[in-house]
Each structure stands twice: as structure tokens, then as C-alpha cells.
Amino acid sequence: MPRRIPSAPLLGLLLAFSCAVSAAPQQQADIEALATSEQWLTLVHYHPNRFQSGYTSQADDPSFFFSESGKTDPEGELRATIEAISSPASGDPNRHARCAFPARDAWIREQLALPEPEVTCTEFEEWKAELNTQAITLVFAASYLNSPSSMFGHTFLRLDPPEEDGETNLLLANTISYAADAAEHDSEILFAYRGIFGGYPGVTSVQPYYEMIRVYSDIENRDLWEYELNLTPAEVEQMLAHTWEIQDRNFDYYFFDENCAYRLLALIDVARPGTNLLDEVSTHAIPSDTVRWVVDRDLVSEVHYRPSAATSVSHGLSTLDSDQRRLAAALANGYISVDGKEINALDDEDRARVLDATYDYVRHQAQAEDWPREIAAPLSHELLVARSGLKGPPADEGPLPPDVRDDQGHDTLAVAATGGYDGTRHYTGLTLRAAYHDLLDPPAGYRPGAQLQFMRLDTRLYTDNQEFQIENLVGVEIRSLTPRDAFFRPLSWQVGFGGRRTELPTGNRVLTPYLEGGAGGTWRLTRKLSALAILTGDLEISKHLPRGYDVAPGADLSLLRQGDRFSLLTGLRSKTWIISDQHRQDELYLEGAVHLGRAYSIRASASRTHHYERYETLWNLGFRAYF
């Protein structure tokens, strides 16, 4: 009996069915593999759990997930996403899954060769067109000690438009930034507490670059570094798509790790798979460190420096000689007029230079320091009128970039091996510091006169009886020592808290919680040497004190030298304890550091202390490395 050959339509149907049956297990295997792939885990911000198997997403917004278990179930979230992006559009197409999550949609379709449904994402396409982005630039704003959120610096991304005739106005470009969504009435102390321990949602936002410059450069006096990223057009597209996915969605903000810099690293990891920048983060993400990691991954093509308004004004004043600076200060403060005899005695070029520098200073003070308009506006007008009748000096190129960028300074993690003598006993010691910089660290790449230490542990092992002790446990220690002059009069200040060894009248030394602070002034003597005068206050709390606590007002007079090869801090500090054990404590101290490049330093210190009618001589020698 002859075999019957199926008709063509039936044969096609059978073949399609057999292919579907054979493809289903393959797609199942593909989905299981994709659920733990690096790119999927990055897209949904999954990270391995530290103390158990599995993953947890750092996204804290339920709307970021399609699966109810999506926060901890990568495979379940992938399957739910595939179902969502494959469903037909109903209602507003802009609410469709592929429009809400275009980066996920594009990646999944590429991996599984899924057909594209007929869904038009008008809002997303209009948003991209409005941003008009050809390239991405990572921008680093230098540290700003007067704000807890910016003490370590700040990073954000600039979305650069296509160049038109080589003259693109980057001030009009947009930026991507991540920050804590804090209430306006929250104090800096509350902000610091909630930023450290949690409590603020973090929000990714898009805003114009000129607004960022106004805040960071013009008002907060922070220099900006611009790092052009060498992303391809496809990588730029992927970054924008993922920004659309996460903007206005909550990722809880933490000051030391899940901060502005951390979120931007995640965006770069999404744009260029395999960079694994987030793998560098352990306990904290310092913005300058994150920039260093980006540079080390060869992600940067060019670097540009944008000085702050204060840096530019200071540079203009520095071009004047001492007599011209005196005249500029007198003009700005209204002691002399623009047509006074001292000004008219100058030749045209010097007069123009003085008027230019004074005008820039007055305008800066009016904006950054809120000089009254009724004073600043008339004076600015008088300076402009006087200047308009003069031929200008050769155009100044403005301040030169620092020799060392912030990302080129020493690493922020420090480890030191020490040895010394505390007046009666010898010891060896170990110091560990999580971050960031102190006055005697190699200064290149850091703000002169600025100190910010976070989580520093000093330990000792005494050689006579092998007794181990914690000498200091510093939670946070900040010092801002900016020199004063005729134009700028910043307040020098310091604050810190933690635990430290305190000597009792019996001679015993106990670990005591403390809070300390101070305020005063700093004056530059030479380019590298400054004099400090600080009024201080200390609070110690301990059950070993007669009243459980003690308070000490005091003063600290010192000299500070910061140099690339050698740094020195020496002075006299005195404080009077007035509550529990009423007595005075005086200390003459000398601390120095020899810098062996930016990775190592040798430190030595010595002091002579008078405390409880006893004199003690202390010294310490150590080797410090930065990681």
C-alpha cells in the first residue's frame, strides 16, 4: 500500500509543532541561565546575600518589580518580565512593560530572540529626544566639609549633546544624579544620622548642568572635574534606557555605601557589561575612589577642569602685588572710591587689573555670601563704569588645573604599624582607618587644611605584660582649616566623637566616650605653612568619673605645614576640666610625616604632657600604607 504524503499546509503545521516542542526545553534552560547572568543581575540591582544563598535587589520600590517575590527571586522576576513585555498593549501604550523598562526589554529580546510587539513608547522616545545625548561625562565635585552629604565629594553624570560646529554649550546639557530625598527642614545632624543608619529614600533625577554648577561651583565653592567616558552609542543608549527605568524610583540612601557615587557605578556597569565597578565597593563608596576605579578601567578618554567661582576669584586676586591687593580690599569694603587718588595713581594696565579683580570679588560675594544688593549693585556698577574707559591687560587664562587631581591622591583606606612609649611602658601598635584623609597624610589631591577621618581604630600591645588595649576608636573626626585674608574670612572649625583612653587621678587609663569641637582662625604664613588658633570644648562620659561626665573648655595654638615630601603639626593645647576632677591639662606636641610617594609614609610624634600634677613624655614611630 503506498504511503500517503501529508499536504503542504499540514506538513508545515507538524514541523512548527515539533520545533516548538523541541524549543521549549531549550528556552527553559536559557531562562534559567539568564536569571543568574551578570547582565540580568546588574539590570535589576541584585547582589549576593552575605550570610545565606540567593540574591536580594537593592531596589526598594515595589513598582520596580513585576513579580511579588522579585526583590529576592531573579528567575521569578525574569519570567514575570518576559510575560509582561510579551503581552499585548491595552490602554495607554506608555504604561506597557517594554515602555516602562526599555533596558530590560531590549536585553531580553536580544538574548531570547523574541519578536517585538506593536507598542509605541512615545513618552520614552520624547524624553530621549529632549535629552539629546551623544556622550556621557562623569563629573566630580570636590569635597565640601560644611555639608555631611558632600564631605567626601560628589559625583554625577552629564549628558553631552552632539557637537554643532565645535561649539556646543555644555551648560545647557542635562545631568543624572542620585541623592537622598531629605526633607528641607531636616537639620544637618538629623541628615547625618539618617544618612548613616538609613531612613531616606534615594532618588535618581535629571536636571540641567547649569543648575549643578550654580550650586556646587558658584555657591559651595567646589572645583569640578569632568571625565569624558568612552562609551559607544549603544552603551549610551543602554544607560539612558536604564536611567528611565530607575528615575523617581526609591533606592534607600546610605551615606557611606549606597550613595551618589555607588548608583552611578551601577549605571556604568549596566551600560558596559563586564566593567564590574560595584565589585570594588566593600564597606563604603568614597566618590574620589569611585572616580579612580572608573579611570583604572580605561573608561575615560579626556579630563577637564572647571574651577569654582571662589578659585577663579582667588586666582585673579593672586595676580596682584601686595599694594594692589590692599587697594582692591579697600575698594571692595568702601574705604576708597574708584576715582580716588590712589587708584588714579596707577597706570592704565594696573588700574584695569585691580578693577577687574575687585569686580569679580564683589560679584562673587554678592552671590555666595549674600552681600546686600543695595551695597553690591552700586559698587559693581561703579567698577564697570571705571573699567570701561581703560584698555585691558593681556587676557588671563584663569587658574591652572592642580598638578594632582582628586582621583590621583592617596587611597583612602590606611593601615599603620607603630611602636612607642607612653610615659611608663613600651608598646607596639596597629592603626586601621576606613577613610579618608588627615592633615599629615600626603596632601596631593586633597584640599589643604582639610581633615576627615571615619572609623579609625588605634590598638596597642604593651611589651612588659602582653596586655592588649584599644587606645582610640574614632567615629568621625573633621577639621576645616582654611586660611583667612583681607578678602575671605572663613571660620576654622573641628568636631569629632568616639572613644579614647583617659587617665584618672589614680593613674588608671579607661576607654571613655567623648565628643569634642572647636572654632577659630587659620592664617597663612608661607605657601605651605599656616598658624592656627582654635578655642576648643570637650565632653567625656564615663562611670569612672565622680559625676559620670566631665567638660573642658580649652585652646589650641599650633603651626601646620603640608608639603609633598614632609608635613608637620606642632603646638600647645590646654584644657581645664571643670565638672568632676577639676584640674588643668597641658600638652606640648610635635607630629611629623615623611611621604614616600602617595602610597606610604613614615610618621613620628612626641609630646610632653602635664596632667594631675604629673609630667609625662610620650613618643611614637610608625609606618603607614594606603590602600
Model-based region annotation:
Residues 438-445, 452, 480-488, 524-532, ...:
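Repeated loop/turn-to-beta-strand initiation elements of outer-membrane beta-barrel proteins
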